[in-house]
Amino acid sequence: MELEIITEGRTPLKVPKTRGQPSARDPVFYNPAMQLSRDLTVSSLVQYGPKIVCDPLAGVGARGIRIAVELSPEVVVLNDLNPRAVELIEENVRLNDVEDVCRIENRDANALMHEDELAGRFDYVDIDPFGPPVPFLDAAVRTVRNRGVVGISATDVSALAGRYPRSARRKYWVEVERVEFYQEVAIRALISYIVRTCAKYDLAFEPHIAFFQRHHVRVIGEIRRGARRADRALKRLGYLLHCRECGYTSEREFDRECPRCGSGSVVRLGPLWLPDFADRERAERAASDARELGLEEAAELLETVAKETGTNPWAYDIHRWASRLGLSRVPSLTSVLEGLREEGFNAVRPHYSKRAVVKTDASPEEFEAVLTEVAGDSGCLHR
């Protein structure tokens, strides 16, 4: 295995030299494309100041060692079942001179979280698997302390985003189909599963920061103990009904016939987390911390996540809506955002899209009215 030394944030790391897309079959797994995700995690955790940290699926140790170096906790437990990964973790711990902070284990991740001497006392537990987090989630939410924080990643977004609805049904117990705001659905489906997993143990989950980035979903949030809190969290789950024909979307239940166009092409998505998937103050503070750490791309993404709060749990694709409405010209994203804001709506391009997509608190009817009006006097958007 050929190695190279790279630097993430302020942390040098010895990693496998990559040739092509990383695979679970690699001798030791490391995905350089996930550096931004790790930047976002470190930035988001500054405000919590975790002292006791668990990284049970550490790989080369990138995430956990970055936390050890950049956040100065008291203890970081780094674990991987792969002996070759453990050897590389040991090298990276020595490389960063954090032997006094890091404890390295070579165990099954679930066994570690259930049986470690610090089980139940962790301030932060990070679950970043290759694939779904489902096999590790029960142990993770139970090993963190009351009011502790978990960071959960899912890379099987093809399931969460509705491309493979049967897979989503089996793994996450959620009904999803591919819709134009599939990234939004994926984030909310994962949060829903975390909430339902916590509720089994009389635990409540509150998402603080969530994002969809490079084909994975990441959620960071707080665990609280108590059956009543768990009940309240469950009440925040619900369904979205979306018409494939006209794009109408609503949280309100209606018959399978769309109330806007009368089409029967309505899909029911859920149960999903329907409130904001981020806390505005937490996201803004994380953005500020990212900037102080010199992580500019992470700061910009977190600022956008903060701006998305207070909008609908879906998004509008300007091109698709213009086509459905038969508009002769497609208005620019900027003109649509400005038009919505002039009418008093919150409006932003979501963090997960580079296309002409809008998140807003405007209803479908209100969005249609603004889009139609703006199309009459705006320039065209060419893509």
UniProtKB/Swiss-Prot annotation:
EC number(s) on file: 2.1.1.216
Q: Does the keyword RNA-binding apply?
A: yes
* Entries under Gene3D superfamilies matching the protein: N2,N2-dimethylguanosine tRNA methyltransferase, C-terminal domain, Vaccinia Virus protein VP39
Instruction: Please indicate which superkingdom the organism of origin belongs to.
Output: Archaea
Chain ranges of the Trm1 methyltransferase domain: 4-371
Which keywords label this protein? Answer: Metal-binding, Methyltransferase, RNA-binding, S-adenosyl-L-methionine, Transferase, tRNA processing, tRNA-binding, Zinc
Q: Which residues bind S-adenosyl-L-methionine per the record?
A: 38, 63, 80, 108-109
- For the ligand (Zn(2+)), the binding residues are 243, 246, 258, 261
Q: Which GO terms describe its biological process?
A: tRNA N2-guanine methylation
Kindly indicate whether the keyword Zinc belongs to this entry. Answer: yes
- What InterPro entries has UniProt attached to this entry? SAM-dependent_MTases_sf (IPR029063), Trm1 (IPR002905), TRM1_arc_bac (IPR022923), tRNA_met_Trm1_C (IPR042296)
Which Pfam families would you find in this protein's record?
TRM
Group of enzyme by EC: transferase
Under Gene Ontology molecular function, one entry of this record is: tRNA binding
Which HAMAP family does the UniProt entry name for this protein? tRNA_dimethyltr_TRM1
Function per UniProt: Dimethylates a single guanine residue at position 26 of a number of tRNAs using S-adenosyl-L-methionine as donor of the methyl groups.
Protein's UniProt name: tRNA (guanine(26)-N(2))-dimethyltransferase
* Gene name of this polypeptide: trm1
